[in-house]
A protein has these predicted regions:
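Conserved pre-motif I regulatory segment
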Residues: 1-44
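Pre-Walker A (Motif I) flank of P-loop NTPase domains
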Residues: 37-43, 70-73, 121-122, 185, ...
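Walker A/P-loop NTP-binding motif
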Residues: 33-41, 53-68, 89-91, 174-177
Length: 252
């Protein structure tokens, strides 16, 4: 049985008829079974490789099939601009099975945040800092808000791994698990990383649940182009570099 066949019938229908896809990409198909089984997953694919759908489609199936209620999935990104870009797409996907996706970050107005608290969507796109603000608030019932939380997707997880903001994210995830009263499924999305197993172990934190790296497309990535040029001296190297991209910013 393919991963696609494991999806909720409503999700299957809209993948074919609303999105018009002839099939799923290898990453998307391979990620379905472990995500449906509740495993922690690190999904790796090149840019525009369908990572968002690899996480969201099986999670929508879990919400619809397992009867999750209230806020069930957090979709965490490092940048507000990325959240703003993703929100309409996730709203559309959630609507395939009668669900909703909301947006919460520092630029979202108070009235919109109040509506989310009053009627939580099944999926919430947000940042680590916004999650901490909710947890720290004394004016909101964060325990009730996160009571039904089941899974967290961390997009661009390599941008968090190992630095101060990443450790802050892990602390927030551990606190969310404590508030929800369950081990939250963690799904990381990333492009190429040097040590995927290490990044997965970092993301999983204190959880002992099964975990795996899903990266069927990475072996076919094009090798980087490398050109060697002998410049003779450090001074000459500086001159050559300065002329390569005159007037443009470059990281050397």
């Amino acid at each position: 049985m393919t991963g696609f066949e494991l999806l909720h019938p409503g999700v299957q229908h809209h993948v074919v008829n609303s999105l018009g896809w002839p099939g799923l990409r290898p990453l998307q198909d391979e990620a379905i079974a472990p995500i449906l089984a509740g495993e922690h997953v690190l999904a790796l694919a090149p840019t525009a490789g369908g990572k968002t759908e690899a996480a969201v489609l099986p999670l929508l199936s879990r919400i619809a099939t397992d009867g999750w209620r209230g806020l069930s999935v957090l979709y965490v990104c490092p940048l507000r601009a990325l959240l703003n870009n993703l929100h309409p797409r996730l709203e559309r996907y959630a609507g395939f099975v009668g669900l909703r996706a909301g947006l919460w970050h520092g630029d979202v107005g108070a009235s919109a945040r109040n509506r989310i608290f009053d009627e939580p969507p099944e999926i919430l796109l947000t940042t680590p800092e916004s999650l901490e603000a909710i947890l720290m608030s004394t004016r909101r019932d964060h325990a009730g808000f996160f009571a039904g939380l089941q899974a967290v997707v961390v997009d661009e997880v390599h941008a968090f791994g190992g630095d101060d903001r990443g450790w802050h994210l892990l602390a927030v995830l551990e606190r969310l698990s404590a508030v929800a009263g369950r081990d939250l499924q963690r799904i990381g999305l990333s492009a190429t990383v040097g040590e995927p197993e290490r990044l997965l172990r970092w993301l999983v934190g204190s959880s002992t649940a099964p975990s795996r790296v899903v990266a069927p497309d990475m072996g076919s990535a094009a090798p980087p182009e490398l050109t060697l040029d002998h410049v003779g001296s450090l001074t000459n190297a500086a001159t050559v570099i300065s002329r390569l991209h005159d007037g443009e910013k470059r990281l050397v």
